[in-house]
From Swiss-Prot:
Organism: Raoultella terrigena (Klebsiella terrigena)
Gene Ontology biological process: butanediol metabolic process; isoleucine biosynthetic process; L-valine biosynthetic process
Gene: budB
Protein name: Acetolactate synthase, catabolic
Family statement drawn from the similarity comment of this UniProt entry: Belongs to the TPP enzyme family.
Transmembrane segments: none
Lineage: Bacteria, Pseudomonadati, Pseudomonadota, Gammaproteobacteria, Enterobacterales
Quaternary state and interactors: Homodimer.
Family annotation (Gene3D superfamilies): 3.40.50.970, Single helix bin (1.20.5.740), TPP-binding domain (3.40.50.1220)
PANTHER family the record matches: ACETOLACTATE SYNTHASE, THIAMINE PYROPHOSPHATE ENZYMES
Chain positions recorded as Mg(2+) binding sites: 447
Length: 559
């Protein structure tokens, strides 16, 4: 039995908080100080933790989320009371939906002032509870370490997400007693039970057209590696949701049907409609609504660390709950024969491969200006090699990128799908670069999404972050526009004015570029990639083919 831990006296609760953050292995915190939380910022000066001041609290959560997604360890946001916390909530809701581990510490008024009408008083626990895995206010100084420790456990374990801790000012500023808790390791799960794994192996053996649907958790590096080993021995037909980008490597590309989502009209969607067995790996319904892809005729298997969240269109016949990688290894040992594609599945995969080759050969020949989306995607494919991390904002461009730009490294591409939040790309890029400063990061947004977080260009310049941000410019919220046009045959609230993004970037101290002709696209991107530090490239885009995205688009219609 463990002995009681030695209780230490701390001059300030903030000192115990910071000590607990160090014990958790935190390397940096993102945030904006204020009177209710400034003692924690002061204590951080005497720690090993780097303070990254940001320009908006939501972006602190986005940056922390990128750290969490790439490392598996929760990133940390630190904000003051009232609007400091309310500004944070979009970032926390996004992290929770995307499965990104984030711990946010928010200042609060003194406990004695909670029921008074005082400056910045707000029930932040009630506000954060619906959009986090864990939301708690510390009510006694001797509970500081355990509350913070449990926030990290909640954020990192199971399906990761966000956690929020409210810190009243009197607890932060006043003396505290307590001891730092060691960072707990996630309990090591085993593989799913043998009987359930045997049932899935038998279902695979009996299936004529099995398919894997890879969700967010499938792209965790250890799970992705297990998939690669499994697929190398027993090739399968599979595809990934947008959230699972990078889960399939190049060696298995011949049986990869691409990414699915949004309009239910991709090669993977066609395979799903033909499948008699659908094996969902690391999938959550928030990633792709089951009603969009599950007709109810196929046997449904759920492989994840958590039981399925059931709904009318997602009731698995078999659930393999346990460590995903270990479960896949066990399942692979029970599959005795190579999986043979049906002629229909083989035709779908071959056609997808032909379309990829068509884009590779002819994409650069789309010479209109403003530029066709496929021309930009083709040029981006040349600069996004395996050493580059790509963060993608939300807008029409993200559909073109998700469908036609390929990546083969787990967590190489970050796409928002749970909330489809605009403005994530640049702060995500900053967080990703801080994790791997030796890697170039390319972020991409539309001109609408960019201005929702473009103030963080100053943060990127201050850090000398090696980031290239690409802006697809069309002076409108086009993804909304194409849907409005289809539904109502007219547009409302989707148009806005131009910005000189080259000058805008230079005003922050970044290098600014503007593509001014079709032939200038590739040279400009190469020049921007060569910049050591933040660079911004503005590319005018012609979205007139966007309505095709909602239909049965074949690239031969364009190329």
């Amino acid at each position: 039995m463990d002995k009681p831990r030695h209780e230490r006296q701390w001059a300030h609760g903030a000192d115990l908080i910071v000590s607990q953050l160090e014990a958790q292995g935190v390397r940096q915190v993102f945030g904006i100080p204020g009177a209710k939380i400034d003692k924690v910022f002061d204590s951080l000066l005497d720690s090993s933790i780097r303070i990254i001041p940001v320009r908006h609290e939501a972006n602190a959560a986005f940056m922390a989320a990128a750290v969490g997604r790439i490392t598996g360890k929760a990133g940390v946001a630190l904000v003051t009371s009232g609007p400091g916390c309310s500004n944070l909530i979009t970032g926390m809701a996004t992290a929770n939906s995307e499965g990104d581990p984030v711990v946010a510490l928010g200042g609060a008024v003194k406990r004695a002032d909670k029921a008074k009408l005082v400056h910045q008083s707000m029930d932040t626990v009630a506000m954060f509870s619906p959009v986090t895995k864990y939301a708690v206010e510390v009510t006694a100084s001797d509970a500081l370490a355990e509350v913070v420790s449990n926030a990290f456990r909640a954020a990192e374990q199971g399906r990761p997400g966000s956690a929020f801790v409210s810190l009243p000012q009197d607890i932060v500023d006043g003396p505290a007693s307590g001891s730092t808790l060691p960072a707990s390791r996630a309990p090591q799960m085993g593989a799913a039970p043998d009987g359930a794994v045997d049932s899935v192996a038998q279902a695979i053996a009996a299936a004529k057209n099995p398919i894997f649907l890879l969700g967010l958790m499938a792209s965790q590096p250890e799970n992705s590696r297990a998939l690669h080993r499994h697929a190398g021995k027993k090739p399968y037909s599979g595809h990934q949701h947008l959230s699972g980008a990078g889960a399939v490597n190049q060696d298995n590309f011949a049986r990869f049907a691409g990414r699915v989502g949004l309009f239910n009209n991709q090669a993977g969607d066609r395979l799903l409609r033909q499948a008699d067995l659908i094996i969902c790996i690391g999938y959550s319904p928030v990633e792709y609504e089951p009603a969009m892809w599950n007709s109810g005729t196929a046997t449904l298997v759920h492989i994840d660390v958590l039981p399925a969240y059931e709904e009318r269109n997602y009731v698995p016949d078999i659930e393999l709950v346990g460590d995903i990688a270990a479960t896949l290894e066990k399942l692979a040992q029970r599959i005795e024969h190579r999986l043979v594609l049906t002629p229909q599945a083989a035709d779908i995969l071959a056609d997808r491969q032909r379309q990829r080759e068509l884009l590779d050969r002819r994409g650069a020949q789309l010479n209109q200006f403003a530029l066709h989306p496929l021309r930009i995607v083709r040029a981006m494919q040349d600069i996004v090699n395996s050493d580059v991390t790509l963060t993608v904002d939300m807008g029409s461009f993200h559909i073109w990128i998700a469908r036609y730009l390929y990546s083969f490294r787990a967590r190489q591409v970050m796409i928002s799908n749970g909330q489809q939040t605009m403005g994530v790309a640049l702060p995500w890029a900053i967080g990703a670069w801080l994790v791997n400063p030796q890697r170039k990061v390319v972020s991409v947004s539309g001109d609408g999404g960019f201005l929702q977080s473009s103030m963080e260009l100053e943060t990127a310049v201050r850090l000398h972050a090696n980031i290239l941000h690409i802006i697809w410019v069309d002076n409108g919220y086009n993804m909304v526009a194409i849907q409005e046009q289809k539904k109502y045959q007219r547009l409302s609230g989707v148009e806005f004015g131009p910005v000189d993004f080259k000058v805008y970037a230079e005003a922050f101290g970044a290098c600014g570029f503007a593509v001014e002709s079709a032939e200038a696209l590739e040279p400009t991107l190469r020049a921007a990639m060569d910049v050591d530090g933040p660079a911004v490239v503005a590319i005018p885009v012609d979205y007139r083919d966007n309505p095709l995205l909602m239909g049965q688009l074949h690239l031969s219609q364009i190329l």
